[in-house]
Structure formats: C-alpha cells, structure tokens
Amino acid sequence: MRPIRAQLAMLWLAGACSHGAPAARGPALAVRTEITEAETAEKARRHDLARVHYQRAIAAARDPDSIAFARHEYAETLVTWGEAPEARAQLEIAAAANPGDASVWHDLGILRHDAGDDPGAIQALGHAEQLAPNDARPRTALAALYWRRGDKANAAREYRGMLELELPERLRAKVEWALAELAKP
C-alpha cells in the first residue's frame, strides 16, 4: 500500500466511524434494506453481490436523503476496494443531493486531495467545517493539508481552532505539538 493510500485509509476510517446526525426524514426503507444487504454481502467478502445491492439502493433512491445515503455508503465501500475515482463521483452526487451533510463533504475533501485537487479539497473540507464546527475531523484534515502545502499560517489557524473544541487529551497534545512545530522558523 502506498503511503498516501495508508493515510487516506486512516482518514477515511476516522470519518466513516462518526457520521453526523441523521436527517429528519432519513432514507427510504427500500434503500436502507438494500444497503443492509450490501453490508452483509461485504462482510462475507461477496464484493460482487455487495456491488449489486449498492447499485439497487442507488436505483431505488428517489428523494435527496435516500440519494445521499445510498451514494455515500457506496462511496465508503468503493474506497476500500481501491476505486477512489468512482467513490469521489458518488460523493459529488451525494453532496449535491444533501448539501448539508458534513460527513459527505469531509469524505469528498479527502478524496479530492487524493486525486490532486487541493483547491477542491480545501473547499469541501471548509464546507464540512462550517456545517459541523464542533467536529475536529474537518479541521484536522484542513490543517494537515495546509501544512503539506507549506501554508503554515492557515495550518496554525486550524489547529488553534481545534484547541477551542472538546478534544481527547491525546489529540490535544498532538495539536499543541503541531502548533509548536509550525511556530519554528
């Protein structure tokens, strides 16, 4: 696994483990059922069958919540299969269907960065941060992206913003370390 793939997988897993609050209406029952079947097939390592169920969920999705849910769930699995470009396309559709879903924007930002689209990644991660200001994930990703690009001022701004959040002590220590490193000439 290439180092960027390892980083992407870690960031993706962090994002996948903590979705934002579900929408008021939520996805349709038929869509949820197909996603459940897809996940069951995936756990049995029946990727071919999982793909069929994800595609059925997408076909059954008629309302914005269902469209966003089906496409986001499929995108998460596509990443694990190494199909990042298709995952990114699914997330673009999910974001258009439900532009208020911070987790979709976060994941889209990560995949845009992986594809070399840093301006698009910054836009998506910034949108996720605006939608979920108390979520450290978009700030963490933005700070790392800015730092990698050599933009120490914006990286430090994101890390300072994280210190205003309720963080686990271990993460707080890492943020303080990052700020100290960024302050060095």
Q: Where are the model-predicted features located?
A:
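Canonical tetratricopeptide repeat
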Residues: A70-E73, D107, A141, K174-A178
